[in-house]
Design a protein with these regions (language model features):
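Class I S-adenosyl-L-methionine-dependent methyltransferase catalytic core
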Residues: 1-22, 27-126, 130-195
Length: 195
């Protein structure tokens, strides 16, 4: 029997192991999902304004961050591609560069949590599109694949497809551009690993 777990994708604890998981994380720099779903959330009384602010701070890909002594630089050691993107974007827009680091650091935490709850040789499928940050295309799937090796996974399969029906027609102005294809990344847990 399938069960939907509601909670934080970067910090959860389940009593049982599962054989597979699938996710579609937010695109970097794409939508403020908390803002987009704000009215529905308030109407259904699922959260109040204060709770929404707290949810937004914890959201994977949040743009609510304070650039300070940033403890998330270690993520750069997990992906040469991420390091390259970070260095290029930092010159143009320091805040956006740190948003990218935060996003991939959150994804690393998610990979570690899923690894801890997968059975040996379990499969984790991730559907994600690339993002365009300050004119630089970020191949999110590739960065996640590189990071996953540090979290006890191997890449088993990757393919992409063209998005034919952009059903979310929210005007993004010049922020991130139109995402035309999604990538499917299939990772397999290396037996005996726990991260």
């Amino acid at each position: 029997m399938s069960e939907i777990i509601i909670g934080n994708a970067t910090d959860f604890n389940l009593n049982n192991k599962f054989s597979g998981a699938i996710t579609s994380p937010p695109y970097i720099n794409a939508f403020d999902y908390v803002r987009i779903l704000r009215l529905e959330t308030l109407w259904l009384e699922l959260a109040d304004e204060n709770e929404l602010r707290e949810i937004k701070k914890k959201h994977v890909g949040t743009e609510n961050l304070v650039i300070k002594i940033f403890d998330e630089y270690q993520i750069l050691e997990c992906s040469l591609l991420l390091k390259e993107y970070y260095e290029k974007i930092k010159i143009i827009d320091n805040k956006r560069a740190h948003i990218i680091l935060k996003f991939f650091n959150d994804m690393k935490k998610n990979l570690q949590m899923v690894n801890n709850h997968l059975e040996d040789a379990g499969v984790y499928s991730i559907v994600i599109g690339n993002s365009n940050i300050r004119g630089i295309e970020i191949e999110s799937w590739k960065v996640i694949s590189q990071i996953s090796k540090y979290c006890g996974f191997i890449e088993e399969l990757h393919f992409s497809y063209q998005i034919r029906n952009h059903y979310l027609r929210i005007d993004r102005k010049t922020k991130g551009g139109k995402i035309n294809s999604d990538h499917i990344l299939v990772l397999r847990k290396i037996s005996g690993t726990k991260k």
